[in-house]
Amino acid sequence: MSNMEDRILSNTVRNEDYEIEGGLRPKFLNDYIGQDKVKERMKIFIEAALHRNEALDHVLLYGPPGLGKTTLSNIIANEMNVNIKITSGPVIERAGDLAAILTNLSENDVLFIDEIHRINRTVEEVLYPAMEDYALDIIIGKGPSARSIRLDLPKFTLIGATTRAGLLTGPLRDRFGVIAKLELYDTEQLKEIIRRSAYILNVYIDDNGAKEIASRSRGTPRIANRLLKRVRDFAQVRGDGRITLEIAQEALELLEIDLLGLDNTDKKMIETMIHNFGGGPVGLDTLAAATGEERNTIEDVYEPYLLQIGFINRTPRGRIVLEKAYNHFNIPFQK
């Protein structure tokens, strides 16, 4: 059984994140840090839609967890000055569930569906005319006497979010007019996010302390805000409440998060690949069985960051460990 949800470095949502993120989320694009190319495009699309007094075209946001897909969706609704309805793919079990949501939307509203790749195929087919024609096809009756009626819907914007864009069907993906990939953040962007969050939380943090937390946050704002909260606890109990470089280092060492933001779970993953499979190539299913992690967890949670920092590579034959990872964990590298 995976203990991924218990990790402080997990980029999936934990209960505490709702409390943290709720008060820290920016409300408008000008306050949204990072993802500059996506922001620039969205500003143009939003301004054009407002100028024409139309609903924004449907938007697909994809990328690793914790990068701000939900936040960006709320911002889009705020910028368009409309309401947002939030749901997720697994929650919409029947076509009737989706119909109830769609018929309760107002003109130009935003419907945000998280994990849209997990939506039921029957439900997905109801989405097609809703997205294309702003209409809902309903079957009345059964058997030979069954007939279809079409209900007009208010014009709306569907924002779909996914960590697995490759799992979307072609017909669904093709109905999104705007497709945007959210990238992992760099240290400077995360430092800015941490400074902003600390200000909102009324916590003093110096530049070096913010940079130290940022450098160990795996390129992910959700993790950065979570670590900030943990370091704040440490500063209040072991210090004077101020977060300095020294306090940040002590707190993160206590949490067993190394200089690159890796923990014992990452170390186990890399060491398993090296010691059990000679550094690879090793298939994803084999690696999942050897580490006790889910295949999807490895692909969505661990791999994006390990790929970004140059510790592993994906090949047609499987995953391989690169020399940089051997050096980091002090394991002799053999070509």
UniProtKB/Swiss-Prot annotation:
Residues 1-185 are annotated as: Large ATPase domain (RuvB-L). The keyword Nucleotide-binding applies. Its EC number is 3.6.4.-. Mg(2+) binds at T70. Disulfide bonds: none annotated. One of its GO terms (cellular component) is Holliday junction resolvase complex. ATP binds at L24, R25, G66, K69, T70, T71, E132, D133, Y134, R175, Y185, R222. GO terms for biological process: DNA recombination; DNA repair. Residues 259-335 are annotated as: Head domain (RuvB-H). Its main location: cytoplasm. SUPFAM superfamilies: P-loop containing nucleoside triphosphate hydrolases, Winged helix' DNA-binding domain. Keywords: ATP-binding, Cytoplasm, DNA damage, DNA recombination, DNA repair, DNA-binding, Hydrolase, Nucleotide-binding. HAMAP family: DNA_HJ_migration_RuvB. Has 3 domains, the large (RuvB-L) and small ATPase (RuvB-S) domains and the C-terminal head (RuvB-H) domain. The head domain binds DNA, while the ATPase domains jointly bind ATP, ADP or are empty depending on the state of the subunit in the translocation cycle. During a single DNA translocation step the structure of each domain remains the same, but their relative positions change. Homohexamer. Forms an RuvA(8)-RuvB(12)-Holliday junction (HJ) complex. HJ DNA is sandwiched between 2 RuvA tetramers; dsDNA enters through RuvA and exits via RuvB. An RuvB hexamer assembles on each DNA strand where it exits the tetramer. Each RuvB hexamer is contacted by two RuvA subunits (via domain III) on 2 adjacent RuvB subunits; this complex drives branch migration. In the full resolvosome a probable DNA-RuvA(4)-RuvB(12)-RuvC(2) complex forms which resolves the HJ. The RuvA-RuvB-RuvC complex processes Holliday junction (HJ) DNA during genetic recombination and DNA repair, while the RuvA-RuvB complex plays an important role in the rescue of blocked DNA replication forks via replication fork reversal (RFR). RuvA specifically binds to HJ cruciform DNA, conferring on it an open structure. The RuvB hexamer acts as an ATP-dependent pump, pulling dsDNA into and through the RuvAB complex. RuvB forms 2 homohexamers on either side of HJ DNA bound by 1 or 2 RuvA tetramers; 4 subunits per hexamer contact DNA at a time. This is Holliday junction branch migration complex subunit RuvB. The gene is ruvB.
